[in-house]
Regions:
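Structured mid-to-C-terminal alpha-helical surface segments
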Residues: 1-50, 62-66, 77-332
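Glycine-rich beta-strand-to-loop/alpha-helix junction loops that act as flexible
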Residues: 52-56
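Nucleotide phosphate-binding site architecture
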Residues: 59
Length: 332
């Protein structure tokens, strides 16, 4: 039995966690449904070769990330030894194959474009926040793509908010009665997610979609502070390889970032933030940041972006010097 099938107990428990941790009830509820889907995915990953990525992945695997993310993004491996039909079947099942009571696939909204499928699952939300609602209340979006290389991949253990903030007695109840426990899932490495977000931010900046842009700018700021991303900038070969994966993906993606624009020239690095973006950045944090101590200022974000751009410029300079050295030495 799923926890949400016992509506009274489910609703009451979410209210307990809400009061204890001061986290909006609609966020706790949606996080539960997101994790329920991800747990089903984790059971099938060896076959599906579908890996968790994006902002929700970062939010679930990093203790330092406290921005709630409500969509599920998946990268589905293209296996060259398999037929096109076999690869397409795995892609479809990754987005459309979840049979969970209380989650209804909205077939009319489903989008199937080339190597990308976006599915929408409805659930009956018990908590409607009229003043500051989620971007997609009562709905989970799953986007599965099979553009290019999915790697690099690593394994992480994740858990829903209701388990994370439960006490020992409550965790025992969740585990024994509803099988709600931490579980392992294969995730794209945060280095790849970081590069993806550099490009996603540019896409939303160009389209003036400031709420989505604000989420990526927040994530980039937090990710940049981690030891792994700091080390990532010191590994030129790995950095170039992952950027190349992303460049190839953007070619296949409808409306992707122009291949001729260098990362250091992305518009959001040099833009003067207008009132619409500043308003969106505040609204994003008002709803999606769990606690006040995890809020950041736009100045902190701009400082981090300047440092990111400077590091990318330095990498380009090192690469150019290496090319010049090889030419002088007659190397290929």
């Amino acid at each position: 039995m799923y926890f949400h099938e016992n509506e009274f107990q489910f609703q009451s428990f979410i209210r307990i966690i809400k009061e204890r941790e001061n986290i909006d009830a609609d966020i706790i509820e949606k996080d539960y449904y997101v994790c329920t889907v991800l747990k089903e995915l984790a059971k099938q990953q060896d076959y599906l070769k579908a890996y968790f990525k994006g902002g929700t992945a970062v939010y679930k695997i990093l203790d330092t990330m406290n921005r709630f993310s409500e969509d599920i993004d998946l990268t589905v491996e293209v296996v060259k030894e398999e037929s096109n039909n076999s690869n397409k079947t795995r892609l479809k099942k990754s987005a459309l194959g979840y049979k969970i009571p209380g989650l209804e696939l909205d077939k009319d909204k489903t989008k199937d474009v080339k190597q990308s499928i976006t599915a929408y699952y409805k659930y009956n939300t018990l908590f409607k926040d009229e003043e500051n609602p989620l971007h997609k209340p009562g709905e989970i979006q799953i986007e599965a793509t099979s553009f290019t290389v999915s790697e690099p991949i690593e394994v992480h253990t994740i858990e829903p908010i209701i388990y994370k903030y439960a006490n020992k007695q409550e965790k025992d109840m969740l585990s024994k009665e509803f099988d709600i426990v931490p579980f392992e899932i294969k995730v794209q490495k945060i280095e790849r997610i970081f590069i993806d977000k550099l490009f996603a931010a540019e896409l939303y900046f160009e389209k003036e979609m400031y709420m989505d842009l604000s989420k990526h700018l927040y994530d980039l700021t937090i990710l940049f502070k981690t030891k792994r991303i700091q080390q990532f900038f010191k590994n030129i070969g790995e950095f170039e390889k992952i950027v190349e994966y992303k460049r190839e993906e953007e070619i296949y993606r409808k409306g992707g970032v122009n291949k001729n624009i260098q990362i250091k020239d992305f518009g959001y690095f040099n833009a003067e933030y207008n009132d619409d973006l500043l308003k969106a950045f505040k609204l994003m944090q008002d709803k999606y940041i769990f606690k006040d101590e995890y809020r950041i200022t736009i100045e902190e974000t701009q400082k981090a972006l300047n440092e990111i751009r400077d590091k990318i410029v330095l990498l380009d300079q090192i690469k150019d010097l290496e090319k010049a050295r090889k030419i002088l030495n007659g190397e290929k």
